[in-house]
Regions:
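Lumenal/extracellular "mature" regions of secretory-pathway glycan-modifying transferases
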Residues: 1-40, 89-115
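Generic structural signal for individual residues within well-ordered alpha-helical segments
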Residues: 2, 26, 73-74, 134
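The conserved 3'-phosphoadenosine-5'-phosphosulfate
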Residues: 36, 46-131, 139-147
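Active-site glycine-rich loop that binds ribose-phosphate moieties when present
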Residues: 43
Length: 147
């Protein structure tokens, strides 16, 4: 979730001229709603659970997809009832890089730096929700690093 917050802020900062600085992450209502709230995975998951039963939903983390693209794509294809052949979806067994930073008119934005206070505040907000999400999707609570 912390890396997702960084990525989302960089994406938004590269497109939105008046995007607040990263140190305003929890002070800016716009950043808090758009970036931090979007990182409350269990809360987001539950919004879909109101409409769809658990067996009709599949959760794959970015880490799983990046580390094991073939296995993850086969799992996705099988889940949707498609033939689990992902050979045409990958480039030399890896996910294709199609949306490089700076493409589509976005500025190249450097990775932000967390102050210790900001990082701890963000962790205090998102970690309990993240752990509920991990438990509800059958993953260990130490799936994500918080350092």
């Amino acid at each position: 979730p912390l890396r997702r917050i960084e990525s989302h802020w960089r994406h938004w900062r590269g497109r939105i001229n008046d995007c607040p600085s990263f140190d305003q992450l929890l002070r800016s209502p716009r950043l808090r709603q758009r970036i931090v709230q979007a990182s409350l995975y269990h809360q987001q998951w539950q919004r879909y659970r109101r409409w769809f039963p658990q067996q009709s939903m599949l959760s794959i983390t970015t880490e799983e997809l990046s580390a094991h693209p073939q296995t993850s794509l086969r799992r996705i294809l099988s889940f949707i009832g498609a033939t689990p052949d992902c050979s045409r979806l990958l480039e030399e067994g890896e996910l294709p890089r199609m949306n490089l930073a700076g493409s589509k008119g976005r500025q190249e934005i450097s990775a932000p730096t967390w102050s210790e206070g900001l990082k701890q505040e963000a962790i205090d907000i998102i970690r309990p929700d993240s752990e509920r999400f991990l438990a509800s999707t059958g993953r260990p609570t130490n799936t994500w690093e918080w350092v």
